[in-house]
Amino acid sequence: MDHLPIFCQLRDRDCLIVGGGDVAERKARLLLDAGARLTVNALAFIPQFTAWADAGMLTLVEGPFDESLLDTCWLAIAATDDDALNQRVSEAAESRRIFCNVVDAPKAASFIMPSIIDRSPLMVAVSSGGTSPVLARLLREKLESLLPLHLGQVAKYAGQLRGRVKQQFATMGERRRFWEKLFVNDRLAQSLANNDQKAITETTEQLINEPLDHRGEVVLVGAGPGDAGLLTLKGLQQIQQADVVVYDRLVSDDIMNLVRRDADRVFVGKRAGYHCVPQEEINQILLREAQKGKRVVRLKGGDPFIFGRGGEELETLCNADIPFSVVPGITAASGCSAYSGIPLTHRDYAQSVRLITGHLKTGGELDWENLAAEKQTLVFYMGLNQASTIQQKLIEHGMPGEMPVAIVENGTAVTQRVIDGTLTQLGELAQQMNSPSLIIIGRVVGLRDKLNWFSNH
């Protein structure tokens, strides 16, 4: 280990930055956030430093560097574009046994600045020892996405509860289980964010008085249409906390690779006309695992409430008094159209969008007359096997045969395929595509040639 990670208490302590440009400004923000009593020395300053000085937040010393500026300092930073001056600042600091950071010159510095994830009072620092700042930044960004924004408020509140929790729970194991409940409680986090004192008190009392062998819970998470980058931040957090993940075939391998490694994985994939696991059995799997006290994530492609049977699954849980919540996902209509260069609405072509299931059943006839109207976009989910029927019905009810159509296969994935044509060709086009596919019908499809950005990447 070349560097010892430490956290410095700098509040109301003298610190010095030598440099008045953009780099120095970024360092100054960090020291000001830490409460340091900051002096900045340079020949000239960018406007932000002047604004801070006018607000009484720091002291500016305009002119050449003088070593006496270090006399009362706890910490210094050399942030100029003059290597010789930076070296001089570093040597002067070292002679006084003051830690000094030299920007972009870790070998000349006595301390280096890590990449920081600030969820105060919770802080995470990431460093490559100065060898690869870009790698440290990328790792910080990954960790940033895993840590909820409200985590700091929860940590601060937890500090206020420590005394009571120690009195309430006799053993370390009981206290640990309580803290685990508190730190994943979304209602408490939201109440803290809103400063809702009544809800904070109610939720805290419920958590403290709730038996430790409490029921599990189920979270319905929308995984989006395929591209792992479209998974929401909250969705990622949920799959990282899950004990069990119940998923279907529309969830990509890239997203499954983000699931907590020691979580149990239950595949319940389904295809049109063929169910690997009957829906009722899926409902029972969710119920059974939650009743064991586990945190269960039901991970679905797209959005769980748009042709995802999410409502059916939640009704089962509700009837059994199992706690549940829902994390929406980007639905296939939105993702596939965007990655195909097809805007679902457009002032000139479509003032509304209809999302329609392609599972056409006897006795469940659609309102084809309204679907055939102009100035709208139709999006058929799971409609590949019914493409010829869709074509026939729309034409019969007055939609022009030259109406533009597109079929998107594996939308948003690197294997995405898009084929377009007219309504009279829809049945023929469908024979060239495989599931999962989405059918888009409307004048907006005609914009694809101009707006298609994804295939060009």
Swiss-Prot record:
Active site per UniProt: D248 (proton acceptor), K270 (proton donor)
Domain of life from the UniProt record: Bacteria
EC id: 2.1.1.107, 1.3.1.76, 4.99.1.4
Binding site for NAD(+): D22, V23, L43, A44
Annotated spans, Precorrin-2 dehydrogenase /sirohydrochlorin ferrochelatase: 1-204
Protein's UniProt keywords contain Lipid metabolism: no
GO molecular function terms noted in the UniProt entry: NAD binding; precorrin-2 dehydrogenase activity; sirohydrochlorin ferrochelatase activity; uroporphyrin-III C-methyltransferase activity
A single BP term in Gene Ontology: cobalamin biosynthetic process
Pfam families on file: CysG_dimeriser, NAD_binding_7, Sirohm_synth_M, TP_methylase
Region (Uroporphyrinogen-III C-methyltransferase), start-end ranges: 216-457
Catalysed conversion reaction: uroporphyrinogen III + 2 S-adenosyl-L-methionine = precorrin-2 + 2 S-adenosyl-L-homocysteine + H(+); precorrin-2 + NAD(+) = sirohydrochlorin + NADH + 2 H(+); siroheme + 2 H(+) = sirohydrochlorin + Fe(2+)
SUPFAM superfamilies in the record: NAD(P)-binding Rossmann-fold domains, Siroheme synthase middle domains-like, Tetrapyrrole methylase
Modified residues (Phosphoserine): S128
Alphabetical keyword list: Cobalamin biosynthesis, Lyase, Methyltransferase, Multifunctional enzyme, NAD, Oxidoreductase, Phosphoprotein, Porphyrin biosynthesis, S-adenosyl-L-methionine, Transferase
Function: Then it catalyzes the NAD-dependent ring dehydrogenation of precorrin-2 to yield sirohydrochlorin. Finally, it catalyzes the ferrochelation of sirohydrochlorin to yield siroheme.
NCBIfam families: cobA_cysG_Cterm, cysG_Nterm, PRK06136.1, PRK10637.1
UniProt xrefs under PANTHER family: SIROHEME SYNTHASE (PTHR45790:SF1), SIROHEME SYNTHASE-RELATED (PTHR45790)
Similarity section: In the N-terminal section; belongs to the precorrin-2 dehydrogenase / sirohydrochlorin ferrochelatase family. In the C-terminal section; belongs to the precorrin methyltransferase family.
UniProt protein name: Siroheme synthase
Naturally occurring in which organism (per UniProt): Escherichia fergusonii (strain ATCC 35469 / DSM 13698 / CCUG 18766 / IAM 14443 / JCM 21226 / LMG 7866 / NBRC 102419 / NCTC 12128 / CDC 0568-73)
